[in-house]
Amino acid sequence: MRRARGKFKGGNSALRVNVPKENAISDYVTASGTFQDGDIMLNKEGIRVVSQTQTSTPAANGNISLSDLETVKVLGKGSGGVVQLVRHKWTNETYALKVIHMNIEETTRKQIVQELKINHASQCPYVVICYHAFYNNGLISIVLEYMDGGSLADIMKELEPKCIKEPNLGVVCKQVLLGLMYLHQTRHIIHRDIKPSNLLVNHKGEVKISDFGVSAVLANSMAVRDTFVGTCTYMSPERVLGGTYGFDSDIWSLGLTLLECALGKYPYQPPGSEEGWMNFYELLQTIVDQPPPVAPADQFSPEFCSFISACLQKDPKCRPTAAELLNHPFVNKYDEEEYGLAKLLPPLVPLA
């Protein structure tokens, strides 16, 4: 296979990583026990953003304190912490509580703070809500909206065949595009990690964007980035090459995500092998060198095939914006009431 053009090179010998100086967690904690990183302050009473350019930041939910929350079960673990399903003792409302031990490597800590800042300031029905956050005894606790339907990746695992039908994806697509349009146009944020496991669903069938740990906030909507973060398998070719990129990189990731959900498998498959990619670098070279995957015309509508092709343009300048894609025929092809994801979810089981 040909070596990818540009900055990307396969093989461990080509990798060079500059490791920045690590700061201890104590460098971020004041004498009063408040965690401060840049313009964000956290303590056991809650969160405060001390120099906010936006005036639209929602006030933290004053009805929530950590002592009012009781753990129901553990939902998952990762990034140096745990996510729990918790219930408010007095209102019986449920939340997802992300608890992170901040004595972790600085890069991960910065990502967590970045996620918190973005979530706390976001006001969009297509972005997971952050209700409150606290810092106490080395732990940051983030109170998030509980998406009880899991992720698109979770839903696919429970279906047979393990894929989401095109009409359902049409409804999903519209909601994700509305979320991306808000992030790109209003917040000037590149998500940088759109994938099935980061698109969450609730029992109403509402789809919301989550996990902003690697997102980039740009000074304006015309700016670009050149850092290499996110899930590599969903990266656009220009990101794999280490070049500059903008909001259009999220559009590539969306196209790849929708195609994976439709096919029931990751769209880039190794030629002549059913066992998956044996070499990670070969996959990245394929993303850079080979034509992008397409939706099979004998399995999907012309509108869906056209939408996927529009997203998976290797030249980022040729990809439409989220706002432009909202006018694509595929997005409004299917009725939201008839094809919402709520019908694919199992019945809700009452909490004990």
Swiss-Prot record:
Provide the reaction this enzyme catalyses: L-seryl-[protein] + ATP = O-phospho-L-seryl-[protein] + ADP + H(+); L-threonyl-[protein] + ATP = O-phospho-L-threonyl-[protein] + ADP + H(+); L-tyrosyl-[protein] + ATP = O-phospho-L-tyrosyl-[protein] + ADP + H(+)
Tell me the ranges covered by the Protein kinase domain, including all copies: 69-331
Keyword check for Kinase, yes or no. yes
Determine the domain of life of the protein's source.
Eukaryota
Q: Which UniProt keywords apply?
A: ATP-binding, Kinase, Nucleotide-binding, Plant defense, Serine/threonine-protein kinase, Transferase
Q: Name one Pfam family in it.
A: Pkinase
Q: Name one GO cellular component term.
A: cytoplasm
What's the EC number here? 2.7.12.2
Which residues does UniProt mark as catalytic? D193
Phenotype caused by lack of the gene: Slighty reduced chitin-induced cell wall modification compared to wild-type. Modest reduction in chitin-induced MPK phosphorylation. The levels of mRNAs of the defense-related PAL4 and CHS are being less induced following chitin treatment.
Example GO BP:
response to chitin
**Residues given in the record as ATP binding sites:** L75, G76, K77, G78, S79, G80, G81, V82, V83, K98
What broad class of enzyme is this?
transferase
Q: Which family does it belong to?
A: Belongs to the protein kinase superfamily. STE Ser/Thr protein kinase family. MAP kinase kinase subfamily.
Described purpose of this protein according to its UniProt entry: The CERK1, MEKK1a/b, MKK1a/b/c and MPK4a/b proteins are involved in pathogen defense. The pathway induces rapid growth inhibition, cell wall depositions and accumulation of defense-related transcripts. This protein is required for full defense response to fungal pathogen chitin.
> What name goes with this protein?
Mitogen-activated protein kinase kinase 1a
The gene from which this protein is expressed is: MKK1a
